[in-house]
A protein has these predicted regions:
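Flexible "arm" and connector segments at domain edges
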Residues: 1-148
């Protein structure tokens, strides 16, 4: 398995997410952000890296991937809500390049998790700007780190 994301793949994921989102009449940015952060924490909980009292921490792979896919879905929804349609192609190129260049994302541990959570929440507390791409790319980078 290669650690790549193509422009076509990301375009297809965004298309699928848009089709899904178009069926939801009451979307709003605050709910998307809250859901995305909650799904991130739910995925982290499946890793159980912080449960040092367990002999074999970590939920089964299907559970982990299910939660990561939920996290990804809300990141894609967030991208569709905050990225202007005219800038979507540029955003896609930036995302694909970030995934290609970022090969050494550290595995999560308690301190790094808190830092990552701070990055997620800080983006919204301080106002969304072009650095939102650092948040939206996270599920892809974690997928490369944990499941490639």
């Amino acid at each position: 398995m290669t650690n790549t994301l193509t422009v076509d793949q990301l375009q297809e994921l965004l298309k699928i997410q848009k089709e899904f989102d178009d069926r939801i009449p009451t979307k709003n940015l605050n709910d998307t952000v809250a859901s995305m952060i909650i799904e991130y924490v739910e995925w982290v909980n499946t890793l159980e890296f912080f449960k040092n009292w367990k002999k074999t921490p970590g939920k089964d792979l299907d559970t982990q991937l299910d939660e990561l896919s939920d996290f990804l879905a809300f990141n894609l929804q967030l991208a569709l809500e905050v990225i202007d349609g005219n800038e979507l192609n540029e955003f896609i190129d930036v995302m694909v390049n970030l995934v290609e260049e970022q090969e050494d994302l550290p595995r999560l541990h308690s301190v790094y998790f808190v830092h990552a959570l701070h990055t997620l929440t800080g983006q919204f507390v301080n106002g969304i700007d072009s650095s939102i791409v650092q948040v939206i790319v996270m599920p892809f980078l974690y997928a490369n780190q944990y499941y490639s």
